[in-house]
Amino acid sequence: MKYLKLFLLLFIIQTQAQQGGMWIPSLLSGMNETEMKNLGMKISADDIYSVNHSSLKDAVPHFNGGCTSEVISPKGLILTNHHCGFDAIQNHSSVDHDYLTNGFWAMKMEDELPNENLVVTFIVSINDVTAQVLDGVASITSETEKQNKIQENITKVTASFAKEAWQENKVRTFFEGNQYILFVTEVFKDVRLVGAPPSLIGKFGSDTDNWVWPRHTGDFSMFRVYANKNNHPAAYSKDNVPYIPKHFLPVSLDGVQEDDFTMVMGYPGKTQEYLPSFAVAQIVNETNPAKIEIREAALKVQDGFMRKDNAIKIQYASKYAGVANYWKKWIGESQGLKKSNAIGLKQNFEKDFQQKVIAAGKQNEYGNLLADFQKYYTEITPYAVSRDYFNEVVVKNTELLSLGYKLYQLEQVFITKGEQAFNDRKENLIKSQADFFKDFNATVDEKVFEQLVALYATKAPKEFLPISLLNVEYKKFAPSIYSKSKLVDYANFKALLSGDAKAVLKKISLDKGYAFVKSLADNYSKNIAPRYDEINLKINALQRIYMKAQLELYPNSRIFPDANSTLRVTYGKVKGYSPKDAIYYNPTTYLDGAIEKYIPGDYEFDVPKKLIDLYNNKDYGQYGENGKLPVCFIGTNHTTGGNSGSPAVDAQGNLIGLNFDRVWEGTMSDIHYDPSICRNVMVDMRYVLFIVDKFAGAKHLINEMKLVHPKKK
C-alpha cells in the first residue's frame, strides 16, 4: 500500500491539462481526473472505475489475450477490430464460404458462429497487493532467490484473495517490480462471431496503409458473449444465453471535431518508456535492423505466392498480416526514434539524473546505475542479436522450423517431467496442429526457409552459429529438408508422434527437418540463452532500482507504469499533426478518400461495388456529416499493441471510435512519447454503423444499441 500512497503523493495537482501516459483506472482520482476535466471530460473518475456500481471498466473486456473489445448492447454484443477477429473469420472461411472476401453477418442469433479457444476477460476489481508480494523480500540479497520469494508470495496471494467460484485472480507487476496489483476477473469462453465486413473494407489499404495516415479502413468485427443461465462464464453450449453486461457503451451519432476530448481504455501490451539511452541505442542500431531484414525477406516470398494463387492467399492472409504488422512498426519506430533524437534526449536526462543523485546524497544507492547499465548492455548485445535471429527465423517465421521447435520442446518435457507430461503435451500438440496444417503450404515455406536460413547463417554473430549453419548451400539445402521431412503434412506428422515416448523420440530424431531444428535449438539453449538470461537478470534488477530512483528523485513528474497487458486509461484530444515541413494532416478522413484510393481488382485498394453505389448515391442516412461520410480520425491518446479494438469515448463516456493503429511517425511511442507527432488512429463509429446498416443490411444489430446525440442536448 505504501507504493500506492507514494505514487499519489509524488504528483502536484496540475491546473494545466496534459496528455500522454497509460494510467491505472483505479487510481485516476486526483491528478488524472483534473487533467481529463481540463481537457473537457464531463464524467468522473468514479464513472470510469468503480467496484460499488457499474462503470466504464465493466464494458471493456480483454479480447482473447491480445486485443481489446467493448460491449455495445444489453445483449452482450461486443465490438473489436477486424484484425483482432481475423483468425476467427479465417477459421470459418473456405473457398465456398469465403467470409474473408465477402464478409459475414448473422441475421439472427442462431446463425452466430462459435469459436473454440476464443475468450474475453472482464475486470471485476483491481487491488493493490504490494505489501503481501514483497513480504520477506527486502532481506534477500540473491536476485534469483528474491524473484523466487516474490513468485512464492504471488502464488499465495492469488490462491487466498477473496473471489467467487466462477472468477479468477491474477497478479501483475508494475513499475519494474516496485508495485504489484491483483485483478479479479471473469473469463467468458463462449464467444460467437456475429459480423465482419469484407476484407476490402476491414483491411482496406492492407499493408501499404498499415501504420500510416490518412487512413480509410473499416477495421471492425462483431462478436457476442454468451453465459450460462446464471449469467456466469461457461464453456460453449446451445443452452447458453447472451451475456447481460453490468454496463454497455452508448454510441454517439455526433462524431468528432478537432480538439474534442477523447479517452481510450484498453489493454496495452508492452512499453519501455524508462529505458536508459544504451538500451535505445541497441534497439535502433542492432536488434530492429536484424528483425526488419528477416521479416522483409519472409513477406516478399509469401506475397509473391499470394498474388498468384487465391487458395494460398486465404491460407496465408492472417499469417502475412501478423508478420507484416511489426515489420512495418519496427521501421517506423526506428525512424521516429532517430527523428525525435530519443537517444540524445535520454542522455540529457541521464546527466540530470546523475546531478539529482548527487544533490540528494544518494550516490551509494544510485551513483553507479548508469555505468552498470552501459557495461551490461555492451555485454548483452551480441547475445540479444543472436537471440533475435533464433526467434525470428526458427520460432516465428519459418513454419517447418517452428513446428520442429515444438517437437524440441516436447522432447524437453520428457527429459524434465517424464512420460505422463510428455503424453499430455503430445496429445495437445497433435490436436492443435490440425489448424496449422490447414493453412500450411510446403512450397511457400520452403522458399521462406531458403531465404531466412541464409540470413541467419550470414548475418547473425559468427561466434554463436552452430556447425549446421556453416558452409551450407541454401538452395540445395532447403529441398533436401522439405522432400524428406515428415513435418510437411498432417498425416505424416501424426504418424511421427504415434507410440510411446521412446518410440516417438527415436522417430523424430531420424527426421531431417527435426535434426536441423535440434541443432539450432541445442546451440541456442547452450551458447546463447543462459548468458543472455544471466545478463538480462542483472539489467532487470538495475531497471527496477532505476525506476525506484526516478519515483524518488522526480516527485513532480508524470510517471506512469509501463504497459503490461492490464487495463489502462489514456486521454487526449482529436488532433491533426505535421509529419514534415509544409505538410499538415487533418484529423478526420471521409469515404471520398477511399474512393480516391480505389484501384479496381487490387487486393489492397479495391472497393466493393455496393459501397461505391452507396457513395455515388450519397446514401449515408443518419451517419453522414455535411454530405460526406466520416471514416477515421486521429488523436493524441498514448496507445500501443493490445489497444487494438479499444473504445474511444467522448467527454460523456459515449463510444465515438474504435482504436486500431498508430501513425507511422509516432510508433516509437512505446519507447519515447512525443505529443507533437504521436497519434492513435480510430475508426469513426458512424462508419461502423453505416457499414452494418446500409452496406450489410443488419439493422437488427443497430436496434440493439443505444444511439445518442450528446452534442445536441
Curated annotation (Swiss-Prot):
The protein's Enzyme Commission number: 3.4.14.-
InterPro entries assigned to the protein according to its UniProt record, in alphabetical order: Pep_S46, Peptidase_S1_PA
Keywords, alphabetical: Aminopeptidase, Hydrolase, Protease, Serine protease, Signal
Signal peptide segment: 1-17
SUPFAM superfamilies xref list: Trypsin-like serine proteases (SSF50494)
One Gene Ontology term of the molecular function aspect: serine-type aminopeptidase activity
Catalytic site positions: 83, 219, 644
Pfam families linked to this entry: Peptidase_S46 (PF10459)
Site (Is essential for the Asp/Glu P1 specificity of DPP11): 662
Gene Ontology biological process terms from the UniProt entry: peptide catabolic process; proteolysis
Protein purpose: Catalyzes the removal of dipeptides from the N-terminus of oligopeptides. Shows a strict specificity for acidic residues (Asp or Glu) in the P1 position, and has probably a hydrophobic residue preference at the P2 position. Preferentially cleaves the synthetic substrate Leu-Asp-methylcoumaryl-7-amide (Leu-Asp-MCA) as compared to Leu-Glu-MCA.
Record family assignment: Belongs to the peptidase S46 family.
Protein name, UniProt field: Asp/Glu-specific dipeptidyl-peptidase
